[in-house]
Amino acid sequence: GLGDVYKRQMEGLFVVDVDGQIQNGLCDSYEVSDDQKTYTFHIRDNAKWSDGTPVTAQDFEYAWKRNATAQGDYSKFTYQIEMAAIKNYEAVTSGEADADELGVTAVDDNTLQVELEYPVPFFLNLLTFSPWAPVKESKLTEEGDQFGVDKDSVLYCGAYTLDQWDVGGNTIVLKKNPDYWDAENVDVDEIDLVVISDTQQAVMAYQNGDVDNVTLTGDMVS
């Protein structure tokens, strides 16, 4: 799905591997306080954006505070953010508190500290979802309302960059990101995704060898 496409381009602190296990993404290491309410994450020294600049703790702080103050319909992501129980989140989203009071702090370029209202045993699981990816503030400011509308208006920090995407078209092409921190272990140089709205046609394309992978609906699995 499109969520998987996004995760290939934008990596967060943690990722889920092919076996469904949580692995470190842009997080090199972390500590948790005895009361399980304070997490300290250390960003990889070699984590980079696709323009070659470092991914920093400030990029995560900016993105997460932006999530709490964003306007518009983000209902599909809201539950993922609310369940994290970050300190003062409700007060910030309601306007009772400023975004600076959210429990997310970039201690330095490579250290992100997060305070929770109460222990959340699945907190690291939540951090594998899309809303927790970093955003480079200077790029967003530069692009303004054009941020994200085409492949060149975004910086990528995942294994792939968006190489081709035509709005309204049916093909998405991803290219290996040479600036990705683990690029040497990315074996596939290009991924071509074809949008086929009819599931039967998609299955036929798979059977004919036109595509390598297809998503099935529940009634087609036996």
Spell out what each predicted region is:
Residues 116-186, 190:
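Gly/Pro-rich hinge or "lid" segments in bacterial periplasmic/extracellular proteins
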Residues 61, 75-138:
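Surface-exposed binding/hinge segments that line
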Residues 28-79, 113, 205:
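Aromatic- and charge-enriched surface segment that lines or borders ligand/interaction sites
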Residues 39-42, 112, 173, 192-195, ...:
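Structural recognition of the beta-strand scaffold that forms the well-ordered cores
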Residues 1-34, 155:
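N-terminal lobe/hinge region of extracytoplasmic solute-binding protein
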Residues 178-222:
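Ligand-site clamp/hinge motif
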Residues 8, 17, 21, 25, ...:
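Extracytoplasmic/secreted proteins, especially bacterial periplasmic and envelope-associated proteins
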Residues 14-18, 45-48, 65-73, 119-121, ...:
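Sec-exported extracytoplasmic/periplasmic mature domains
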